[in-house]
Amino acid sequence: MNLDSTISFRGATIRIPRQPTPAAPRNATLLPGETLPPVSEPRVKPGERAASRGADSNRSGMRVAKLHSAYGQPVSVREVTTRGERDQFVKFPWRIYAGDKNWAPPLLIEAKAFLDRKKHPFYKHGDAALFLAYVAGEVVGRILVSDDPNYNAQHGTNQGTFGMFESINDQGVASSLLNAAADWLRRRGRNEMVGPIDYSTNYPCGLLVEGFDTPQRVMMNHNPRYYARLLEDWRLTKATDLYAWWLDDSGDMLTRWSKLATRLAQRGSVTVRPVRFADFDAEIARCLKVYNEAWEKSWGFVKMTDAEFLHLARDLKKYAVEDLVLLAEVDGEPAGFCVTLPDFNEATRPLNGRLTTWGLPIGLVKLLRNMRQIKTGRMAVLGVVEKFRRRGVAELFILRSLEHGMLSLGYTGAELGWTLEHNDLINRTIEKVGGKRYKTYRLYSTPI
């Protein structure tokens, strides 16, 4: 008898397999209503030689110097190759962020989909690997390392990236993970490593270094304070900072934005309209052209492929509000693109990663209810094609988004960002009309 069940979420059908429940390991962090399989290192099969004391051989054939944790026990790093290890990789953050009220647990179904080599379009042109760190048989850290040939071709560089870094507060563990990532890239001929970046800067990136006391917003990173020390004590140095800004309904912010946008818009015939969801694929094709042109010269940017952009757009459509996805045209020519998302971390945070419990869509019901109660947003994308800048396009985007979000949807505030630290034009404009820089994220690099 088939015990699987299915649920529908905004047009998507999700199959929920019913599986036996294994026993939980010592010190495991459990999600509500579940137990986890034992966390252990792969055993050495009969006839195989165990790794030497001074080095660790992972299953990709790479030799990594073995370090010790602060407790004097050796750290072992292994590449993820099985479904069980992938589950451990996805669920490990629950150990790091237990008790952190500002962390937003990802939906497990989405976290697994992001790493699916068969379905995520990044793997059509790039490659990546996942690593887990173990001490005394327990998972104590994780890291993603990726190689994007498109980025190197666009910028004339020879780099790879690391991301999804999580570690207990232990330099031996962190260094072991970073060593494994660097060695993986060296084997592919790369000579520089940059991060934290999950595949590319089109996805979550940056290490939080300022602003730990406010909630994690949608599609942004969150991490403990000690991560910066772990990365810097390895040998990573600052490449650039990213700023996140806070806009709220205090004072006369809307009035100031309105005056600025109106004055600048008089310089040209600018039209701002919502993207038509009824003609979604055609509209997304227009937006992709603008997106890639607007950010082409930005630090760290790599053009998204058609498949990547459509994949991401369809994912975000589940949560997006049509009047907050905007396309600008100047004399009929696409000139800019802006996306403000409801901060659905507000809706998902109470679910602790689960849409289902014991096969029942309890989390899904809560999610649909919570989505109607969201009070903040995040302006995640705002780009203007270079020849149309200084015509009020960006200012009109921000004004329209604030007006609809605050006046129509009842939002009390919104995050804008990220922006590059050296983008003086946009940073000064945001400050001038009352925006407050409230978070800073750092990207690091090192020769390898």
Predicted regions and their residues:
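A short beta-loop-alpha structural element at the N-terminal edge
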Residues: 76-88, 272-286
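Acyl-donor binding region in acyl/amide transferases
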Residues: 152-235, 240, 352-433
